[in-house]
UniProtKB/Swiss-Prot annotation:
Family to which this protein belongs: Belongs to the imidazoleglycerol-phosphate dehydratase family.
Matches recorded under PROSITE patterns: IGP_DEHYDRATASE_1, IGP_DEHYDRATASE_2
Compartment(s): Cytoplasm
Name of the coding gene: hisB
Organism field: Geobacter metallireducens (strain ATCC 53774 / DSM 7210 / GS-15)
Protein name: Imidazoleglycerol-phosphate dehydratase
Stored InterPro entries: IGPD_sf, ImidazoleglycerolP_deHydtase, ImidazoleglycerP_deHydtase_CS, Ribosomal_Su5_D2-typ_SF
Species classification: Bacteria, Pseudomonadati, Thermodesulfobacteriota, Desulfuromonadia, Geobacterales
């Protein structure tokens, strides 16, 4: 079973092509023109063992908002398409990741019901040129388009880069767990018979 998807999104604000292979080796080729986002997507692929290619162009002369949000949209769509009928997946994943002084935790339920809980109090508004409020926008876009319940929490931390990076690493590891196929599961992991 090949769990792959390629999604293209073209609007007046962005042009994005994203290819995802769930059962990958952590290989990434990322070009978004938003260097900090490139870094986060690269480590998402590596720590989740997903193969991920992203080629994105957007109206970054205005700001990074449309590009970041639209990549979240397309990543959510790609995950949903690659998972297909979701038969046999574990559905749930959870990971806590330390990064120096920071501890972040992400829990995922690929339930078909989009809901984001985001408890991340970042002490600064920017990382370089990147507006940190866009981290929430990214996760909200993934949640809405995958149809998942995702909780993102930073328990403590001081360095804003470490805090965001720990969130993306925890997200990668939790998503890796949730998307794994368990041979013991017949159908889908729900008493309703549908996700």
């Amino acid at each position: 079973m090949s769990r792959k998807a390629t999604i293209e999104r073209v609007t007046k604000e962005t042009q994005i092509k994203l290819s995802l292979e769930i059962d990958g080796a952590g290989e990434a080729k990322i070009c978004t023109s938003v260097p900090f986002l490139d870094h986060m997507l690269d480590l998402f692929a590596r720590h989740g063992l997903f193969n991920l290619q992203v080629d994105a162009r957007g109206d970054i002369d205005i700001d990074f908002h449309h590009t970041v949000e639209d990549i979240g949209i397309v990543l959510g769509q790609a995950l949903k398409e690659a998972l297909g009928d979701k038969k046999g997946i574990r559905r749930y994943g959870q990971a806590s990741v330390p990064m120096d002084e920071t501890l972040a935790s992400v829990a995922v339920d690929i339930s078909g019901r989009p809901y984001l809980v985001y408890h991340v109090a970042l002490p600064k508004v920017k990382i370089g040129e990147f507006d940190v409020e866009l981290v929430r926008e990214f996760f909200q876009a993934v949640v809405n388009n995958l149809g998942a319940n995702i909780h993102v929490n930073v328990m403590y931390g001081d360095n804003v880069h470490h805090m965001v990076e720990a969130c993306f690493k925890a997200f990668a590891r939790a998503m890796d767990q949730a998307t794994q196929v368990d041979p013991r599961i017949e159908g889908v992991m729900s008493t309703k018979g549908k996700l």
